[in-house]
From Swiss-Prot:
Protein's organism: Arabidopsis thaliana
Record-level GO BP terms: mitochondrial mRNA 5'-end processing
Gene Ontology cellular-component terms listed: mitochondrion
UniProt name for this protein: Pentatricopeptide repeat-containing protein At1g62910
PROSITE patterns, sorted: PPR (PS51375)
């Protein structure tokens, strides 16, 4: 492409000014702008001929030190190697994502008098763009044009990528238009870069439309283009559009690969289209596209989330038969599923299989097993697993700690749970709502009301927001520990806040009031439930009936029973047993017998408290054996 360099430069400067950048920064030595963190080291002599490495073994350089040593050999050589050879090394380092090192090496080349060419500058522009330093990328472009280099399509595509990642998508679109105007022909890579940028900025319709525009401009989308679009659509949940694009792609000359199928299968799994994902898996297999570990892991993980652990196990066996090695994600998903299904033995067997295959468990694996041990009251083994993961340099997160703390609190070992909480804080981890709520509940269960309140106060002071479950546990604990006045203060604050109390909150307060002898207050709150948009459930009715019975207000209790039978919710075993005990204590044998018959006709039986009361009254002669027979 023959274009006037001065014309190109002029138009690019116009483009910058139009985008509100002004003239690009003037940079006497732009490499100095990479900051004090640039790579510095004295070059050691490396063994071997650098030419042979650059020619045949450049792909072997996977460590930064190897690259720096090779650069050291090159700059010691006389004459200096060609710029082409330096570019090979810089490109290899850029592929390691060590962009700062690329800039630093470029600076040292400049200091040594090794001139950069168009390709070198393009590498630098790409590095600055990848580091989201667009102004420095523009400065390099300005410098290279000042030196007489015409930017090529690769250079401008890198700049385009910089615009996309700097959240300047409108500038990116304008740059492509400017490129066309200047006589450049955007290639597949250019368009794919812009498509990716459009998806990054939630412009899915524009991204999809650009695929058709590519064809109209004589540029055919390739597998990477389609993969970018499919990935963007799946992340947005537009799975149907992704599937139609797959069909359109396969009707053309491009064959979908396992990566595209994996993307759609994973999208289907995430958006709960499990059966469609399995059908697509079968379809790809029938087309001769071999699934890989990612395919199986997505499906297994999704099946586990749906509780279909037997199907997940079948897929695991299938992949092993096909010599596709499961990875930590595959095993962890199954282990977690088995734990949640209560099949801890199977989970342990899978863990043993992981170790046998030299697959290192990750934090998710360990956390799942710790949860399993806690669920089965095997706390010592849970603690051992916790210590094992730390010894393997797999450090627990808040979820892991919270799981183990919950296990200790459940086992009424709340002090050990609190010790874990302190250890977690010392590691710099901040407990979340679940952590604090678990401890508050644990202390209330241990009848340690003071420490429960202390933990709640600490929770609020560090900025962790209580949820409605936290408040319900706090209110319930205060009420059951005879601190109704404090509970009322919290309840009134809750009603003024933006958080909506639920039916459980109201039930707790109604019960607290009734048990504290404030039945009228409880009744007032009960009657106001409908005004708050909350329908009383059977527990609310039973609580109120129990309160009336305790107060001796039999008529009000009977009235509520009648209302339940007429309007719902229907009475349950608790309703009848509460009323039967109240009538028995009042010596009303006839009413008690009628209630027992009604209860039995509804399919309910006497509970332990009722049978115990009848047995005691039978022993002291207040009842005859017929009552016990009726109950049983």
């Amino acid at each position: 492409m023959q274009r006037s360099i001065s014309l190109t430069a002029k138009r690019l400067f116009v483009h910058w000014n139009l985008q509100g950048i002004g003239n690009p920064p003037t940079v006497p030595s732009f490499f100095n702008l990479c900051g004090s963190g640039c790579w510095e080291r004295s070059f050691a002599s490396a063994s071997g001929d650098y030419r042979e490495i650059l020619r045949n073994r450049l792909s072997d350089i996977i460590k930064v030190d190897d690259a720096v040593d090779l650069f050291g050999d090159m700059v010691k050589s006389r004459p200096f190697p060609s710029i082409v050879e330096f570019n090979k090394l810089l490109s290899a380092v850029a592929k390691m994502n060590k962009f700062e090192l690329v800039i630093s090496l470029g600076e040292q080349m400049q200091t040594l008098g090794i001139s950069h060419d168009l390709y070198t500058y393009s590498i630098f522009i790409n590095c600055f763009c990848r580091r989201s330093q667009l102004s420095l990328a523009l400065a390099v472009l300005a410098k290279m044009m000042k030196l007489g280099y015409e930017p090529d399509i690769v250079t401008l595509s890198s700049l385009l990528n910089g615009y996309c990642h700097s959240k300047r998508i409108s500038d990116a679109v304008a740059l492509v238009d400017q490129m066309v105007e200047m006589g450049y022909k955007p290639d597949t890579f250019t368009f794919t870069t812009l498509i990716h940028g459009l998806f990054l900025h939630n412009k899915a319709s524009e991204a999809v439309a650009l695929v058709d525009q590519m064809v109209q401009r004589g540029c055919q989308p390739d597998l990477v283009t389609y993969g970018t679009v499919v990935n963007g659509l799946c992340k947005r949940g537009d799975i149907d559009l992704a599937l139609s694009l797959l069909k359109k792609m396969e009707k053309g000359k491009i064959e979908a690969d396992v990566v595209i199928y994996n993307t759609i299968i994973d999208g289907l799994c995430k958006y709960k289209h499990m059966d469609d994902a399995l059908n697509l898996f079968t379809e790809m297999d029938n087309k001769g596209i071999r699934p890989d570990v990612f395919t199986y892991s997505s499906l297994i993980s999704c099946l586990c989330n749906y509780g279909r652990w037997s199907d997940a196990s079948r897929l695991l066996s299938d992949m092993i038969e096909r010599k596709i090695n499961p990875n930590v994600v595959t095993f962890s998903a199954l282990i977690d599923a088995f734990v949640k299904e209560g099949k801890l033995v199977e989970a342990e067997k899978l863990y043993d299989e992981m170790i046998k295959r030299s697959i290192d468990p990750d934090i998710f694996t360990y956390s799942s097993l710790i949860n399993g041990f806690c669920m089965h009251d095997r706390l010592d083994e849970a603690k051992h697993m916790f210590e094992l993961m730390i010894s393997k340099d797999c450090f627990p997160n808040v979820v892991t700690y919270s799981t183990l703390i919950k296990g200790f609190c459940k086992a009424k070992r709340v002090e050990e749970g609190m010790e874990l909480f302190r250890e977690m804080s010392q590691r710099g981890l901040v407990g979340n709502t679940v952590t604090y709520t678990t401890l508050i509940h644990g202390f209330f269960q241990a009848r340690d009301c003071d420490n429960a309140q202390m933990v709640f106060k600490q929770m609020v002071s560090v900025g962790v927001h209580p949820n409605i479950l936290t408040y319900n546990i706090l209110l319930d604990g205060l009420c059951k520990n005879g601190k109704l006045a404090k509970a009322m203060v919290v309840f009134e604050y809750l009603q003024r806040s933006t958080m909506e109390p639920d039916i459980y909150t109201y039930n707790i307060m109604i019960e607290g009031m009734c048990k504290a002898g404030k039945v009228e207050d409880g009744w007032e709150l009960f009657c106001n439930l409908s005004l708050k948009g909350v329908s009383p459930n059977v527990i609310a009715y039973n609580t109120m009936i129990s309160g009336f019975c305790r107060k001796g207000s039999k008529e009000e209790a009977d009235s509520l029973l009648k209302k339940m039978k007429e309007d719902g919710p229907l009475p349950n075993s608790g309703t009848y047993n509460t009323l039967i005990r109240a009538r028995l204590r009042d010596g009303d044998r006839e009413a008690s017998a009628e209630l027992i018959k009604e209860m039995r006709s509804c399919g309910f039986a006497g509970d332990a408290s009722t049978i115990g009361l009848v047995t005691n009254m039978l022993h002291d002669g207040r009842l005859d054996k017929s009552f016990l027979d009726m109950l049983s």
